[in-house]
Amino acid sequence: MEISMMESSRWKKILPELLAVILCLGIMCVGISLKEGYHMDELLSFELANARYNPWIVPTQPEGRLAKFVREEIQGDSFPETVSNLTETVKDVLQNRRNSKLLSYKADVYEEPVWISAEQFRDYVTVDGDDAFDYLSVYFNVKDDNHPPVHFMLLHTMSSLFGGTLSPWLGCFINLVCLGITLWLLLRLGRQLADIFSMRERGRQLGILAVLLYGFSTGALATVLLIRMYGLLSCLCVALLSVHVEKWKDHGFDRKNKGLIAVTVLGFLTQYFFLFYCILLAAVTAAGLLCGKRTRELWIYVRSMILAAVIGLALFPFAVADVFSSGRGTEALDNLASGFSGYGARLLSFAKIVADRTVGGPLLAAACLAGVVLAVTAGWHKYQEYRRDGAEKAGQNVGPNAGILSLLIVPVIGYFLLASRMSPYLVDRYVMPLFPLATLLLALLLCYLGKKLSEVCGWTEWATGICLIVWIMAVQGLRLAGYDGEYLYRGYGQQEQLAEEYALLPCICVYAGVGYYENLPEFMHYDSTLLVTAEELADRKDVASVQSLDRVAVLIKPGVEESSVISVMQEKYGLEPEEALLSEGVHGDKIYLFVKTSENVKQE
């Protein structure tokens, strides 16, 4: 009976926090249910995760070299046969090096784009029984990309659990779990920071404010909806901060650093932008430990971070090439080396993104101004102490607050400055880790102001807390209701249904760049698909494979001149547009149904 009462009392204590987290996750689930389509990078994530040893879709090479080798030389009729083939291959590579069968193997490369079947497209982005839980394939795929493997392995796990399925829920569920962990970490940080800043009685309030500010933000929704590694990255940045705050508070950097090392390694293996935050946080921590004369902690902390770097590079040595010699890596480094040219405009663009995705420009600007005023006031008081009591006594009164504030603020500002300079595009994904960190700082400021308000007006902690919570839910709820729809791709479901309706027909996708990735779900329905540029369609030598068609769906991507495609289909292939199936899709696509002309039928 007594145990039951204790359990009931414990649940009552955490009920407000639990309700806040559940409410936020419930809202995110509604958002996921509204997602219909994908950004091309999201579908690239599915391909890197699930296409067996085949990292790219190439119209002239549907099956990659390594994929062909694995299918023909490694995969056996039984597991022992597969192991035997793999063993022989390893021996051959070790003995013959460049002359080994693996390294001299050639893929089937065609002179011009070939028809790719619906089954092949399904194999690109989904998992069946033969390639489920094949993490070695994921590892080999991402070594040719510019990202480390952890998120892709998680996505492959979800796809393996739900074989043959391509659904937003597979990727968004990972982000949803990461969001849940992030919200729990914000609650934990609330208690940690309230204890440090002499607001222990407001620890729960601080955590709940941070949870609602972030969990009700459009930034959290965008992070959950985007099936990339940024939800996991955000979670790991907050986890790293929580570990640092706890160890700073408890003087614990000299013991039990396995969790610190694990979070650091996972972050490195998730996204290289993690290094922005990690290195800055480590530098501030090391400086704080040095200034605080915590020498033993400093050396063990440095040793732990070096060990984390060694483990990360040992697990994924391709990271060095990704950062320093890959296309995306050199682009980022070139951006950094370009100095201040255009930097002001980039800073303003990313500042607007952070404001829009957190609490809005006016509120964030007011919070920053209030923070500056408080910092100046504190600095002035410290200066007065210095003049009155001398440097030694003034230094003794600094306490842990300055160090913790540095841990909270400096890495956030540094990350923002670096991401604004080095990001390839002016989009929200690159600053997503800042959203929970910025809302945590705002929650800390609101909690502090609420405490001062209680002291001045005589309000109870409960009253100020309720007022702040209601205000946050109202403001953030209205902003969330006006979400701009990014990453939802509403209307794409209708386009995919169109592909299902005409599933017996082949499809010709005329694209520019690599825009066909956005349409992979459709290509899983059409009988087969030909991926061509407008020039390739006009100059195609294999005329018969198109000319022989009675009916074909032609998908014209943005950037392609519609009239020229129609002209080529009429004059070269004898096919006339019978019906416009889609005038403008969510990605700007146009789809026509072409049929064989009567003259062409007579000639045959």
Roles of regions detected by a PLM:
Residues N50-H147, L161-F162:
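Interfacial juxtamembrane loops and adjacent helix segments
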Residues E2, L241-L260, T264, F276-V310:
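Perimembrane helix-loop-helix junctions
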Residues V470-L531, E535:
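Membrane-embedded, lumen/periplasm-facing catalytic core of multi-pass transferases
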Residues D41, G231-L236, A402-V412, S420-S454:
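Hydrophobic/aromatic-rich transmembrane helices and adjacent perimembrane loops
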Residues L19-V21, A262, L446-R479:
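Signature aromatic-anchored transmembrane alpha helix within multi-pass, membrane-resident enzymes
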Residues I208-V211, G215, G259, T264, ...:
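Transmembrane alpha-helix segments characteristic
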Residues L170-S198, A239:
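Transmembrane-helix motifs of polytopic, lipid-linked glycan transferases
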Residues T157, L185, L212, F216, ...:
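Specific aromatic-rich, kink-prone transmembrane helix
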